[in-house]
Amino acid sequence: MDATTTDATTAKRKRPAASDIADDAPTTVDEVSDAEVEEFYAILRRMRDATRRLGARPPPPRAPAWRPSFSWEDFADAPPKQAPPPPQQPADHERVAENATPPRRPAPGLDLNVEPPSDAPATPRSARAPA
């Protein structure tokens, strides 16, 4: 094989220039109202305030590691147990209360749709660092 046939078989097509691609794509600009912009920044403020409020808490204290201490009495044979008396049947209303499930409470967490509590004032716009 000579060099001219090798170049022809391995040559790749050139990509179109970026200006050609931009002309083909339709360009649409969505107009955004001031109310939508303010709502967006309000959501960002609530996220930042919630992060500061939730992240500022110190971590809960850790429980000390369990260090078992055994004695020889722990390994001694237990005395034979007597048969327990048969359990008494509870009344119907007690049985229903016993088997009833407790009402579900919402899990505490981050809800961005809720305004922050009044005790944690929001950061004013003038205090924010410029972008």
Curated annotation (Swiss-Prot):
A motif (Nuclear localization signal) lies at residues 12-15. GO terms for biological process: defense response to bacterium; regulation of systemic acquired resistance. Keywords: Nucleus, Plant defense. Belongs to the NPR1-interactor family. GO terms for cellular component: nucleus. Its main location: nucleus. Acts as a negative regulator of disease resistance. Acts on basal resistance, age-related resistance and resistance mediated by the LRR receptor kinase XA21. Plants over-expressing NRR display enhanced susceptibility to the bacterial blight Xanthomonas oryzae pv. oryzae (Xoo). This is Protein NEGATIVE REGULATOR OF RESISTANCE. Changing F40G: Slightly reduces NPR1/NH1 binding efficiency. Residues 116-131 have a biased composition (Low complexity). It comes from Oryza sativa subsp. indica (Rice).
